[in-house]
Amino acid sequence: MNKQLQDLLITIVAGMGMLLSTLDTGIINIALPFLKEQFQTSTDIAAFTITGYTLALAISILPLGVLSDKFGKLKISYLGFVLFGLSSLFCGLINNISLLIIGRIFQGIGAAALQATSAALITTLVSEKRKNSSIGILGIMIGLGPILGPSLGGIILSLSFWQLIFLINIPFVILGIACNNFLLNKLSEKNNKRQLDILGITINALMLVSLLLGLSLLNKLHLFIVGIILILSSLLLGIIFYYVELNNKHALIDIKGLKNNPQVISYLLQTVTFGFASAMIFLLPPFIFEQSYHLEVGQTGFLVLGAPTGLVLFSRISSKINNGDKNKLFSHIGLSIIIISLIFLLLINPNWPYQLLTLGLFIYGIGGGYFQPANIASIMQASPMEIQGSTGALQRMLQNIAISIGSAIGATCLNIWSNDLLLATRIGWGITLILVIISLKEVIKFFHHK
């Protein structure tokens, strides 16, 4: 097969999978009030359509990463497209909230297979000269999903055809399956003989359920203590997981390997920080535009596009000028620009023109555009080729968890200081700024000592 065609098809499969899996979260978020009315249920029950998807994705992504190393990234990606497509069709055809939640759980498992394999498909199968460009496109898809979701969801709901929020996935799934199937028939992958770590998977699942459910309860004052208990339980389970996996030959996460490779730990710390920061960037600005500047929802929806616009543009630009040897430099540049944007956002007050807030978001997007593709490439390059699927899955899981933590802390700030929006947002920006500075400082320290 023509190498250029192969690279194109792999990039389509990886990018399409990442876009679908991130797009679907944003679409369902805006549909919650509609689903509550449609199924005559409570907000808490309707919210399980989000919680079920998120938990299924988080729990299954690491095992699917291991399976992709064992059986092949293309096979697991193919499974992901099929499962995601069938569950999307199921969700679009049923008219029962319990069945919808079940469908969303299977959709989350399909999304996990797509996210677990996206970066690994590129790093193991795309030619060296196009690898960075493909990773840049993957970064664009990661940035587009969360922002296109709410916009697309709003348009679909305005048509009074809520089933379309699920059925719209089908044409893209068919394209992904067609490309994936063609590649499966033309390519062979090098696989390893890793075994599934059932004990590690079980502890990891319990840890993630406790953490994510605990985070979801933090902004409910009457359940705040329960949320804290669940989060503390997840920390205890995390400690148990660490010691169980440390000397496990078939560990779900190669703890011993990570301890011997502090470079990867530094990159993963950056990933977590960026996920946390991105959650704040998407959560806080709409409140500022609507409550401080008294703008309409339509205007707000347009003005918050600053961050994803910057991320999409500069993901493409940075990947064009980076041939793979500038990943460390671009990571540092990206984090430094993010720090500048957070300082700018921290200083903004309602007396400033609201356009400056969009400018601050755009500057953040520029930093993200430099940082994210370089960070993904750095993590994958620093990991052995035989565990690229597991590494990609770990990177996505950590970023997803960081997004959940950032969203929970941001929402908690807004609830605690509900009468002082400026203070609430500044505390959110301040926490984020400190984390990014620590992340950049630790990375620079590592490379300086190296």
Residue ranges and their predicted role:
Residues 65-199:
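Helix-loop-helix hairpins in multi-pass membrane proteins, especially solute transporters
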Residues 51-65, 115-119, 305-317:
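Central cavity-lining transmembrane alpha-helices of secondary-active solute carriers
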Residues 22, 26, 92, 108-116, ...:
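Small-residue-rich segments within alpha-helical transmembrane domains of MFS-like 12-TM solute carriers
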Residues 8-20, 28-30, 43, 226-230, ...:
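12-transmembrane solute porter fold
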Residues 31-61, 298-302:
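Extracellular/periplasmic helix-loop-helix junction of adjacent transmembrane segments
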